Amino acid sequence: RNLGKVIDTLTCGFADLMGYIPLVGAPLGGAARALAHGVRVLEDGVNYATGNLPGCSFSIFLLALLSCLTVPASAYQVRNSSGLYHVTNDCPNSSIVYEAADAILHTPGCVPCVHEGNVSRCWVAMTPTVATRDGKLPTTQLRRHIDLLVGSATLCSALYVGDLCGSVFLVGQLFTFSPRRHWTTQGCNCSI
């Protein structure tokens, strides 16, 4: 909505300036005013569409886009094995974002290697950032988190504090509140 005020000022100011041109000002000013009204209609449509989504507004959309900056786009990992450095794509502990019983959320560019019992084995990458133990995506735990996020977004929208809640969610991405459930190592040399 704030961006719309800037665009309105520019387009309407341009239309006024066009009206002051001698001889051709009247037709050019009218055309520029029509263009400014068309831009205003588009702005109103975008404001209506983004303002009526539960828990979303255009500024929340921009904050969500900026949240992509908190996760690296690609990575390579190096481990020190008896004085030698090996390039591996096994996730180090610093790349693990969230752990569930059967799924691990990690940064892109690596695959978790989990030590269970006396053996370390690679988990199956379902997406660039999600790996599971057996290649099946568990839905029970995901549904619980999705329900919590959707409920929070709806409540924030109903209380008209969507921007504040969006900011809190983004700051929350910087902190992990869940304990470690798996022992991840870098001894598997998993393939992506």
From Swiss-Prot:
This is Genome polyprotein. GO terms for molecular function: RNA binding; structural molecule activity. Residues 1-52 are cytoplasmic. The chain crosses the membrane at residues 53-73. InterPro entries: HCV_Core_C (IPR002521), HCV_Env (IPR002519). It comes from Hepatitis C virus (isolate EC1) (HCV). Residues 48-51 are annotated as: Important for lipid droplets localization. The keyword Cell wall biogenesis/degradation does not apply. Signal peptide: none annotated.
